[in-house]
């Protein structure tokens, strides 16, 4: 969120006070293009997709819309923008964002140090005050106009190559399927904040509080390998293919194991196919979306399908073709950014030396479970929605020229695809 509330924000602030500069026109054009995609980050309830490190800043999520409103003359567009701002601030005011002294806390929807960064301090959350820059609007028009509900975005699908994601909208919620975003630095829990399969307004992601046990790792919408008593979280995967219909990545936790994952973005159901090529034995956990653990929670593992229900959330995952088993993880307290207590459905499969594949079906929604599109997995690829996707080549890297050539070719392909 530092992209909208910093880079675009200050560019528009410059454009507001230096309109004679030619660069100001460029800044406004860039923000207009950005706004088309950024609008999809917000649910009908007002909350935005929890993604990245810049989450303790609360309703700074709408700071971009506050400054952008200065440049909008169209009544309908301005009404939509005002609605986004109002709903987001109201949603935040309904969360536990104040401490016992009345100050904004460090955390997302409640005080939570597990998700914080080393640079956070008591005043960090007050970046949210940047959102009140709409008070600088030169006319009273913004304040007099009625705020509108969001336009009907149901079943919207948009691929955004700049953030390696496909965003979809369903039943009033936003879903961002992610493949390729990395943050290889000293910040905490980067694999949780950037590298999960899915981020959604349906439920915020979880962060790890300990490397002992899946209840402490809390890897919603991600993978875990277990070898003996050691756990390895999916991180630093490589993009093999990215578009609005399929996302393919390869994760190599070490040289003896390769897991190529095919994700077909869809809601409320989506498929994850994991092609495993291994020289050792291990367990593979695949987790669905977290669900608030409250008094209305119902857990079910009937027919080897793990589903969690409460009043306004449904999350489930199961394995096709009877591979492995499905269960539900009761997570340790305070791992989730939105709820102090959550549960996560998951599948677990044992793999021996060799090449294997597993097909998992995930559900995320707020209403009754709907029928899912059929998928076929063959020895040479996947057939889904009348399109055949051949399996990608797996290779184990070494110091040979062939291995180095493949690595260079893959990087070039990724760069070319990005600029296309």
Give a label for each model feature:
Residues 1-149:
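Extracellular polysaccharide-recognition and catalytic grooves
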Residues 16, 22, 29, 36, ...:
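Context-gated lysine
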Residues 15, 48, 60-63, 121, ...:
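A sequence-composition feature that detects small, non-aromatic residues
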Residues 123-293:
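Non-catalytic C-terminal accessory modules of carbohydrate-active enzymes
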Residues 215-419:
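Extended repeat-based interaction scaffolds and adjacent low-complexity, acidic/S/T/P-biased segments
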